[in-house]
Each structure stands twice: as C-alpha cells, then as structure tokens.
Regions:
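A short, Lys/Arg-enriched interface patch at domain edges and termini
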Residues: 2-5, 73-104
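N-terminal flexible/basic segments that precede or flank functional cores
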Residues: 1-17
C-alpha cells in the first residue's frame, strides 16, 4: 500500500536541457499566456503566477494578463531554482527523465 518515491535525475548538462526544452516548445508560439505555461509544466496556475510575482519567472504584463516569452520560460525551466524544487509536478519529473534519455 505504500508508494515508493523515485527521485528524478538532476539536470547536469544545462545546454542539453535547454536544447531539449527548445525542441519541446518549438510548436508553441513565441509568447504564451499563463495557461500554456501551466499546461506545459504541469504546475497549478497559482504556482506559475506566484513565480512571476516574486520574479523567478520573467513575464510581461499586458492588459492585466501575464504573457511569457518562450525564451524566459526556457531560462526558468533550465534554472537550478526550478529543478531543485522539492515538490515537483508529475510532468516535471517525467520531463526530467525524458531529457536524460533525449538525443538531439
């Protein structure tokens, strides 16, 4: 009845991780809203907005709406702050495992 927690691999090669996320985000627009970032990361909308408010994730405020350029999202996804989060989303863990096996 107990679940075994397997820790995801830590992102060692930032350049490879950056190329991985660039390939994953290639189909998305260059500037996206919070909903697209939520869909991609698997984190709650409030969490993503909190990252923006405290300055961890850079975003543009446009008509009372946050817009996130793809390059800012990739910077955040490759950051130590993001990858050292204690409570990772399932999608975050899956992407870390996939990035480890990924070849460009």
């Amino acid at each position: 009845p107990y679940k075994i927690r397997i820790h995801p691999p830590c992102a060692k090669d930032e350049k490879k991780l950056r190329r991985y996320y660039e390939s994953k985000l290639a189909a998305l627009p260059d500037v996206m809203d919070v909903a697209a970032a939520v869909d991609f990361t698997g984190y709650n909308r409030r969490t993503v907005c909190q990252w923006i408010r405290v300055g961890k994730l850079k975003a543009l405020s446009l008509l009372q709406k946050y817009m996130i350029p793809k390059c800012y999202l990739i910077d955040w996804l490759c950051s130590d702050d993001y990858n050292n989060t204690n409570r990772k989303s399932r999608r975050h863990i899956d992407m870390l495992w996939e990035a480890q096996k990924w070849r460009d």
